[in-house]
């Protein structure tokens, strides 16, 4: 379990194929000079780390990097399939008992991919707009929580596009600190991002799908 508060910006160092070429192994370098990640060599094998919102298992670790393996399904349904050496990765270690709950509960199970529609300056911050993936728009509500590339954010508005596409667009505000310490700084219109909808919205929708009585 995670909170959506990114504690470091990692970099993909190596990418290799495993499992007959369908799965992938990534070596991710942790940020230097960051106390949160200075002891990655001491991380337990099997530990969970959220990498741009996707919960991954540490299978190897060294002085300044850790290694994860990713299945073909995860590669196909998340941004991980586009990772290459140099890609910037939002990092968060799993929540521990007693840690501050500063964001919202994030499982690290990506629900789908949203598309960057654009970004505009707004009163010192930046309003980012995304096109929601089909089937997930109904879970996204104004003032609700959403994780984008693992970052806990509040939805500002949700609106249907009037361009005949039947797509739904939603917006969030990113302050300069968040932009500087996450991979939002590298996003461009048309890019895909991992999103995880709020757990409460997911369970409410599931309950409503059953007959009342």
Question: What does each model-found stretch correspond to?
Answer:
Residues 1-213:
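Conserved loop->alpha-helix
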